[in-house]
Design a protein with these regions (language model features):
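Hydrophobic transmembrane alpha-helices of multi-pass small-molecule transport proteins
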Residues: 56, 78, 127-149, 263, ...
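Hydrophobic/aromatic residues within transmembrane alpha-helices
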Residues: 33, 44, 48, 95, ...
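Transmembrane alpha-helices of multi-pass small-molecule transport proteins
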Residues: 37-87, 114, 171-179, 198-217, ...
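Helix-helix packing/entry segments at the starts of transmembrane helices
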Residues: 19, 44-47, 85, 89, ...
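Glycine-/small-residue-enriched transmembrane alpha-helix faces in small-molecule transporters
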Residues: 1-46, 152-185, 207, 272, ...
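Specific transmembrane alpha-helical segments of multi-pass solute transporters/efflux pumps
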Residues: 26-27, 57-108, 144, 235-253
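Juxtamembrane helix-entry segments on the extracytoplasmic side of multipass membrane proteins
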Residues: 8-12, 37-42, 46, 69-75, ...
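Alpha-helical transmembrane segments of compact multi-pass small-molecule transporters, enriched
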Residues: 26, 51-55, 107-121, 136, ...
């Protein structure tokens, strides 16, 4: 990779920091919408991607032209859409109805650990002792926020249920990551680009919501401007713009360095939840973050993965 200039590197780092901020603030925004629109969760999910899709497809057409998936692409695209869009959003929205946004921003950090665990069976990924220790550290951090969250204004049983749904979201997103890696390794140079992939996956995933939206009949409700603004934030900024910035960051500074910015998302999630929702700040969150952060770093310091040979 060609070394970027100092100015380009500074701009890219600023973009990546803004990605972490956009994703972090999405947690309290999601909490506000989930609680205020408790009878319309699928409508919120659908509208979020309805806002994101024009941005993603316009950017795709600008960068790559009119990219249409080939026949052999559709099956993996449907699997990726069902897991990363439909099931993940179900875990996200229903989880945010029940738990604190700051807690959820920490719990979702277990996703890379789920990826590593699934890779043992689905990809030829060997787990060394450091990875096992990392899993234990991350799990301890998650357990700590499950059992000792300072957000006691939410009943304990509700927080447990909500955090469990967020964990479900982290798990199904890990399935998406594994299926995407399998698709990339199997298709080689004949694969869709990452930009085309996320655009088409988002479109297919959005379609999955339609039957549930019809059942909710959101057109019978008067939607206020604040709700539209918050949904637009999730769709345009947190989903579409953040992804585009992240993809640019990967191109400039590489995947490993770009991914390191994701580790600070909980910091923005906790602080923005405190500022916007008046959620509690406590040392438990700091300890949980440190355990998850270093646990994930140890898990990610594993040998490269590859596809298993067919038996």
């Amino acid at each position: 990779m060609e070394q970027p200039s100092g100015r380009k590197l500074a701009i890219t780092n600023l973009m990546m920091l803004s990605v972490a901020m956009l994703w972090g603030v999405a947690w309290p925004v999601g909490r506000i919408l989930a609680v205020d629109l408790v009878d319309y969760p699928f409508s919120v999910m659908f509208l979020r991607y309805s806002f994101a899709l024009p941005v993603l497809f316009v950017w795709m057409w600008y960068r790559e032209g009119n990219t249409i998936p080939k026949q052999e692409d559709w099956k993996p695209l449907f699997l990726m859409a069902f897991t990363s869009v439909f099931l993940y959003q179900v875990g996200y929205m229903f989880g945010m109805q029940r738990t604190a946004a700051s807690d959820a921003s920490l719990v979702i950090g277990f996703n890379p650990v789920f990826v590593a665990i699934l890779s043992i069976w689905l990809l030829s990924h060997r787990m060394n002792s450091g990875g096992i220790i990392g899993i234990c550290l991350s799990f301890t951090g998650i357990l700590l926020i499950f059992l000792a969250s300072p957000n006691v204004q939410i009943p304990f049983e509700e927080r447990i249920a909500g955090n469990s749904l967020i964990m479900f979201g982290a798990f199904v997103y890990a399935i998406y990551v594994i299926s995407m890696r399998g698709y990339i390794l199997e298709r080689g140079e004949d694969q869709l680009s990452s930009l085309s992939l996320i655009a088409w996956v988002s479109l297919i995933g959005c379609i999955f919501f339609i039957p549930f939206v019809i059942n909710e009949a959101p057109w019978d409700r008067v939607w206020i401007n604040e709700e539209w603004l918050l949904i637009a934030y999730l769709g345009v900024l947190s989903t579409a713009v953040a992804y585009v910035f992240f993809a640019i960051g990967v191109d400039v500074i590489g995947a490993n360095r770009a991914s390191s910015f994701v580790n600070v998302v909980p910091v923005f999630g906790i602080l923005s939840s405190w500022f916007l929702l008046d959620e509690e700040l406590g040392w438990i969150q700091l300890v949980s973050f440190v355990l998850i952060y270093f646990g994930v770093r140890m898990v990610n310091a594993q040998p490269p993965e590859g596809m298993k040979n067919p038996k």
